[in-house]
């Protein structure tokens, strides 16, 4: 069951609809993630983690992740020029997602781009 299944708030102004299940078709092998959006809240599930954050560019409402060695990562996330960008400790860009036609381009901090296709969307009702 999606985390934001009960949310009916429209997407925030200027936010591109990335909702759905995305599967990599080039770039990093095994890429698969689900993106949920409601208002300015986003939940990304994949890669053995769940990001739950607001698109307000603050660390307070950003993604807080814990790595395998218990290291903490805190990212501010913003949506600008149709690109969702994760900024580690709000110091530098680490990950971005953008729509390119029918695909999503996921770019990691090392510059590797993964092109993903949306294999399903959430039903309207």
Model-inferred region functions:
Residues 115-117:
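Generic detector of short, aliphatic-rich beta-strand segments that form the cores of beta-sheets
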Residues 44, 53, 107:
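Short aromatic-centered micro-motifs
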